[in-house]
Amino acid sequence: MRVRIFDTTLRDGEQSPGVSLTPEQKLTIAKKLDELGVDVIEAGFPLVSDGERKAIKMIISENLSAEICGLARANKKDIDAAIDVGLKYIHTFIATSDIHLQYKLKLSRDEVLAKAIEAVEYGKSRGLQVEFSAEDATRSDREFLKKVFGEVAKAGADRIDIPDTVGYSTPQYMAEITKDAVEVTKLPVSVHCHNDFGLAVANAISGIQAGAQCAHVTINGIGERAGNASLEEFVMSLQCLQFGEKYETGIKTKLLYDTSRFVSKLVGMTVQPNKAIVGENAFGHESGIHTHGVLSNPLTYEPISPELVGRTRWLQVGKHAGIHGMNAMLEEYGLRPDKEQANQILDKVKNLGDQGKHVTEVELLTIASEVMKERGIKRIVQLTGFSVSTGIGTMPYAFVKLNIDGKEFSATDHGVGPVDASLNAIQKITGKISEVRIKDYGLASISGGSDALCEVTIKVEDAQGNIASAKSVGEDIVTTSVQAVIDGLNRIMLKKLLKEKKVGN
């Protein structure tokens, strides 16, 4: 069965508290979604603002492969606003639960039914494709909900949507009301699930199993309050889990991780490390038992291949690590400790872990070199001097001095802020000496307050396209950023050096 993917990242996703996108940003995300292969892009709510209308027009003008839809309340003013920006497809809604009727709309059930019918008829009379949505459907009286769906179907609706507006449904109940909608309307049915109880994806899948043909989803599950059903989790669950029926989507799954990171950066919402499919830890392993299993056969502790979603697996050496995982990491660099050496290295790593320290790849190699008496394994790049200057009315600049493999280099550069200036100065040195460039930079706050800890994540890339990532945590954003870049440079340059040494041997 082919399942239709209706992406509402640009509408419901943007309603996440604190998220606000420019028209240009919405356009770039729309292009990414189209490349990913979604069937429908809900581009926004035309009545909201001039910027929203501009964004929708820009997206429509791109002539993307995906259908472009816009939100409209069940009234002529909203529908006219959608028509004015050039939309041919609207998602129109009105609440049907008694709590919404009493406290928000101040309408009777008969009045709500009349408005729903009128909106659908008006939209169809203007030549629009109309998807009707009964807001708060899962808390609505079931018989009244069936009546509304039946009447809007008679009025000409093209599609019916069942929103679990406050994430109140269970998978079983979602299946029941989906069957109701399919039987009453004989129309294609969509499900729109929120994640207030962590059941959005499960409810969406249950709706599909019960006869729905489409799910409303967002990248990374962003959305109001606790968010919406996550596109990546929903798609991969349909594709990989055993449901007794084969489901297909048009999603290019190898682009999921890249799309997730792209959206995360633009909306300013960090993806939690343990998030399914796209979280940093989704294909990371530290435990010795798990690492040994994965090295023998990845399927022992991975339900899917990371490459299927544009990822790679990674191993972490820490207090829970085992000999097999550690040796596999060292083997990558041509280092083969004997049994006694391996145990010594692992003991040192575990001792650091017991002290609450995170052992980086470079630190592991340094420990290994000391135990194995290997020469030439060291931190290739060392920060020997660093200062920044910034202020109102002055251009921020930074001075950086690096020791690279025994040679001193220094540079100064400007930037839009002290962090940018510092990274530009480092880039000025490394671009000339080692052909390594800073590919990506991310910043997240770990704790609150003026003395909050920040976490900086960076990616660096060499001329051959090899990429290394590094993280640093600290109270000072500028210093932490510089340290993360230095760690990343050491990783990629040390990896290159040891691989050359391995080939030479």
Show where each model-derived region lies:
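Mixed-charge, glycine-accented linear interaction segment located at domain edges/termini
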Residues: 466-469, 473-502
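C-terminal helical cap(s) of enzyme catalytic domains, especially alpha/beta-barrels
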Residues: 59, 223-250
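A mid-to-C-terminal "edge-of-domain" accessory segment
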Residues: 2-3, 9, 236, 243-412, ...
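Positively charged, aromatic-enriched nucleic acid-contacting surfaces
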Residues: 398-402, 446-469
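Hydrophobic alpha-helical scaffolding
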Residues: 19, 45, 68, 72, ...
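Small-aliphatic-rich amphipathic alpha-helix that forms the alpha element of a beta-alpha
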Residues: 192-219
